[in-house]
Amino acid sequence: MVRIRKAEPADAKRIVEITTEAFLQYVKAAGIKDTPALHEGEEQVLEDIKNKDVYVALVEDEIVGSVRIQKMDEDTVYLSRFGVSMEHRNLGIGKLLVNYLDAVMMQKKVKHIILHTASKASHLIKFYYNRGFYVDDVSKDKGYIRVQLRKDLMY
């Protein structure tokens, strides 16, 4: 059974491990050499736990996924550092995390969730499309083509 909760400081090390694992796959899929997520340490995760909404997915007592949410303005949040451990992928954990976030954000009266992903990471774009996201913008601001995906929450 999967359980989702807000991250605690003691979770930081495992969150770094999952983020690194997920973003090593991301750079391969994106055809890029590097991403800031691969250079993040426990200190940054602890800072995010303090200043953002960070959630973890657990199977039994093991953290197997994580995601971060940052408020952009009154109506919009930014989803980042979303990842599920390799061992636990394709089991529906990512879907559960997104569904959970949708419910929490609707309770908070958030209207839009946005995120960025590489245009070449078609499996991620498909995943997000299947969760109700759509392409809102395209940019090359990081040196490769990224799409901004957006989800409008319905009340």
Go through the PLM ranges and name each one.
Residues K71-S80, R89, V110, D141-I145:
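A conserved beta-turn-beta hairpin within the catalytic core of GNAT-like acetyltransferases
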Residues M105-T117:
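Conserved GNAT acetyl-CoA-binding A-motif
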